[in-house]
UniProtKB/Swiss-Prot annotation:
The keyword Transcription regulation applies. This is MAT+ sexual cell fertilization-promoting factor. One of its GO terms (biological process) is cell differentiation. The gene is FPR1. Residues 169-237 bind DNA.
Amino acid sequence: MAAFNFEAFSLTPQGSTISAAPRPAAPAIDRTVQQQCGSFGYGNRAFQFDFASLESLPEDANPGLTEVLTAKYWNHFSIQLGHWNTLKVIVLDAQMFSIMPDHTKKGVLNTMKSYLGGADAMYARDADNGQVVILAPRRLMESNITIVGSTTVWDPKKRHVQATAEAKIPRPPNAYILYRKDQQAALKAANPGIPNNDISVMTGGMWKKESPEVRAEYQRRASEIKAKLMSAHPHYRYVPRRSSEIRRRAPRRNRAQEVANASPIGENSGAPIVGNPIVTTMEQQQPLPDISIAPNQEITKDNDVSHLIDPPHVFSGQITELMPDVANFLPPMIREGWSPLHDFRAVLNGHTGNNGVDCALTPESESQDDFVGTPSSTMPDNSAFDWITGTEEDLAQIFGQF
């Protein structure tokens, strides 16, 4: 914010003209206050202003001048009070504030109170920025105020830190905690660099082996500490930390251990992965039957593999039951009693069909070296076959020479 160098004005006795008057000389700086303000990074003259002194100002000698200056300053400051400023906080430049006459400061403060509907307002120095003075409702700043020297300082963060520190009451230690604390120094001296976890394990074993007299003594000490705490804080109640606040270190250690113990790829490639549902399911399945046939082996009743193929009616019956009209559009391969091996069983057994359909290949197909025709010239003419009324024998005759 730019610094405005307003001169101090005074009215003539007649009140008709306004003349400029020189500013009074600045008083000597109070070094004690300056040192106190130094902790906040301040030390200028403006910071020494006693905001509380506005309540006990002497009578204004020039009320007309105060009214004019109050209007000028308020018009400049009130620009910040838009609808976006829900807290109704005005930020003033410290240098501008330092040259404002005291009665003008009080006039701006009273105007702010009127703007707030009669609610009390106050000035305060911002604890984070020494060049800023805050004018805001008292209810907003009063609980966050710190007095430095004679100056009011608004420091919300300090209040939050103090409130947190006051609310945190340490949990009274039990007998074992006191015992561990007494043994920790000796264990560390005897075992340099020992981790705290190992100390806990060692002291736990030592505590179990201690005599009843020693354990009773630590129980007595723990009871005394708890009694003192309850006397100082009668309403104390231990509240465990939420699970989200606990640092989950154990799962990370477990995952790191799993990675370290994992065998490289290929060492146990035949072993199933534990907990893998896919591997477990595959292990429970029966091995698939071997339906392979030698290249020159004929399909006979002894080695017929059609029974290994799902019966066609398993799917064809479901289709026709759900959609009766679809049966008119299905080729004979989907009819009941048909399997993919039926049409070629006769071919492999050397049969050529019953109705004498000539399926001889064209001359172009007799020798692959002399092939000059189109690919369609090597295929049998099956365009006349009726896929709706045709039989398996008709289809077998068409492909009988293959």
